[in-house]
Amino acid sequence: MRRRFFSILYRLTGHWMPDSYLYIPFFGRNIHISIGLYYRRFLASRAIKNCGKNVNFERHARFSRSLSIGDYSGIGKDTYVPSDVTIGKYCMLGPEIVFYTDNHNTDRTDIPMCQQGFKSPRPIVIEDDCWIGRRVIILPGVTIGRGSIVGAGAVVSKSIPPYSVAVGNPARVVKSRISTSALSTDSN
């Protein structure tokens, strides 16, 4: 009941607060005001299942109450995070990201697709220290490995290995962030 109350309060009032990091010129200096950051963090941390410390929820960020997000992570403007999503520590999520954890059934051809219902939700996991760019679409069952970067506008339909850079539609890995020799010493 308590989480529901704070979730409703966040939805009703959180978007009215200023941006998380607002700089106002004052006698030749930029004054940093972050009341929106603290207000949304206060409400969201009480509305979701697991909220790490120093998490940032930008204006118009929406999420389910079952969200689990790690320390020092941030959700960008106009991003929607449904249920069954886990976000690790130190993750940067850009604006307008869309997560899909479920989808329509389309297996049968004898009845219309709109009457076939939904497939079971498949969880999405974003491991620690990831950067997800603007307008990325992440499809059901995907895991984005630790330290990975997903470029703006990518459609992620398959899991991304750790320390990778993925871009495009569909997203494909274009490079590794670390050398293979560093990977082998990391695992020992």
Spans of features found by a protein language model:
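Extended, small-residue-rich solenoid/repeat segments and analogous flexible loops
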Residues: F5-S64
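Short, conserved structural micro-motifs that define repeat-unit consensus positions
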Residues: C51-V55, G88-C91, G145
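Flexible, glycine/small-residue-enriched loop-and-beta-strand segment within the central core
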Residues: S34-R41, A61-G70, G74-V142, N169-P170, ...
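Acidic, glycine-centered active-site loop in nucleotide-sugar glycosyltransferases
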Residues: P162, V167-P170
